[in-house]
Amino acid sequence: MSQMHGTATHEAGLHSGPPPRPGQGREALPLTPARRVALLIGVPTCLALTGFIGFDLVAMVGQGHFHFSHTFAATTRQLNVNAGGGNVVVKVGSGPARLSGEATYSLVRPTITERATADSATLAYPCGFPVGNCGLNATVSVPAGTAVAISSGGGDLTASGLTGHVSLSADGGDLTATGITGDISLQTGGGDLSATLLAGDVTLGTSGGDITATQIDSPRVTVDSGGGDVAIVFTRVPQDVQVSADGGDVTIVVPAGPTTYDVTASADGGNLSDSVPQAATSAHKITASSGGGDVTIEQST
């Protein structure tokens, strides 16, 4: 009995004192310079990301829309429209210039503003928040010969029948232009650009989409593609063609015939084919280059 008692007393001695707290006895990780940097970067980033997601959800819940219609002065000969992020259709119509459609917004309803002079008007739809949907889904109707500068920050832009000075820009969507005559500038930020039946001096550009232009009756054409393919088909002998593509293929098709061209072409990462009649003294010049694709210059069949 005395041995059992002694053993019990010895075990009690081993467990004497207050019970250990969870985690007691573990050493804290040292706060090294690398861990300080990770905390300084990671914590604000996580907080910012959480706040942005929450704000985006609030903006989605707080979305609204309203219909609008606006007629410009009959003397307007130059029309500038910044449609925010909506889809825009531009066409020729009778009567004074007119804009109508549906406006969307998040949280706070913006006001459509107009600044006008004797012969020009500038209309803008300033979106107050960088999240959610905000823009004008609009149709713009202008008299023939009206100079236009139309831009959309995120939607598609479609134009037809315009004449005069025409500048169209779709920062995030596709751009489609048909039957336009004059001094023409068509630009996209990342979408595809499709044009047909253009006449006059033409400038085409995109940061990342493809450019396709057919039935082009233009003496001077300048094209700059940031990453997509370029294809241009002429219905008349061009005077000066300049095409540059950072990474896509380039195809230029000119009318069949005896006309010679002064050609300067390069394909840094692809194949080069230039089968058109050539003469260094020709007044018809073609300059084409691609940073990563093929370059083809040929006559129509």
Model feature map: region roles:
Residues 124-210, 214:
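Non-cytosolic head/periplasmic domains of membrane-anchored proteins
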Residues 72, 80-83, 92, 103, ...:
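Hydrophobic residues in beta-strands and at strand termini
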Residues 78-80, 89, 100, 122-124, ...:
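Beta-strand secondary-structure signal
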Residues 193-301:
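Short, surface-exposed interaction patches in beta-rich subdomains
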